[in-house]
A protein has these predicted regions:
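Extracytoplasmic metal-acquisition and chelation regions
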Residues: 1-253
Length: 253
């Protein structure tokens, strides 16, 4: 989501839009404030304090989410940390409820004439999502206690749902590429702690995770961080399902 390629059509769409739906917690800070500035839509403008959206047309999906990894102090020495906390809460399937509720509430506010329709659609969606969450909970039981490393520190919410214990990252620090010294220490740590799983988020190169797998015997699982990031992940439900199945496949005997 940090590396979305901007297109002129995005500005046109924002200029004409009644609302913009976004994850929030400044995860879109690389592109959303600039797009909102150029679009000059009075219903939505950039918030210089939070790097999010400000105005009646702004629909954030994050209100109500239990935010993880809120930093106590801010320093460039920590790498590219998120001041408002880890914004990748969409990787916990249970947060799908909150996301859907926030979208329905936002659309009802922006378009009150059709509020009943949005609430009806929310009820229908949750009726589909809730049984899937229960099913995924049972599937995820096989992942509880599995030790893993991820490429980037965007998986705490995934760990909270699955019970996977993430012990380190391939990156030296958030947004900072690994050094040979860090990788050597990571290999030692993985062997010592019997780390069985390497989680590669789809936006990162496969080379280093593959090398780590060769060195340690751990298996690599690829997960998507947003819809359409992997084949067959066009929706939140499909993304959650694909991620879970990829993890289970990697740790299967």
């Amino acid at each position: 989501i940090h590396k979305i390629v901007m297109k002129p059509s995005f500005v046109t769409r924002l200029n004409r839009a009644d609302a913009v739906v976004y994850l929030g917690l400044a995860v879109e800070h690389v592109f959303l404030p600039g797009l909102l500035e150029v679009a000059s839509n009075p219903a939505m403008r950039p918030d210089p304090d939070t790097m999010n959206c400000l105005g009646p047309g702004c629909i954030a999906c994050s209100p109500g989410v239990h935010v993880l990894d809120k930093p106590e102090t801010l320093s460039r020495a920590q790498g590219e940390i998120h001041p408002q906390g880890n914004p990748h809460y969409n990787l916990n399937p249970e947060n799908g409820r909150i996301i859907a509720q926030n979208i329905a509430a936002g659309l009802s506010r922006v378009d009150p004439a059709n509020a009943s329709g949005y609430q009806k659609n929310l009820k229908t969606y949750l009726a589909e999502l809730e049984p899937k969450i229960a099913e995924w909970r049972k599937m995820a039981a096989l992942l509880k206690g599995v030790k893993a490393v991820s490429y980037h520190k965007d998986v705490p919410y995934l760990g909270a749902f699955t019970g996977i214990e993430f012990v380190d990252t391939i990156e030296l620090k958030p947004g900072i590429s690994p050094t040979p010294t860090h990788l050597a220490e990571l290999v030692r740590k993985m062997k010592e702690q019997k780390v069985a799983l390497i989680v590669r988020e789809q936006q990162f190169d496969a080379k280093t995770p593959a090398w780590l797998a060769e060195q340690t015997g751990a298996k690599v699982a690829v997960v998507g961080t947003i819809a359409n990031s992997l084949p067959g992940t066009e929706t939140f439900i499909k993304l959650s399902e694909t991620n879970l199945r990829n993890l289970l496949k990697a740790v299967a005997p």
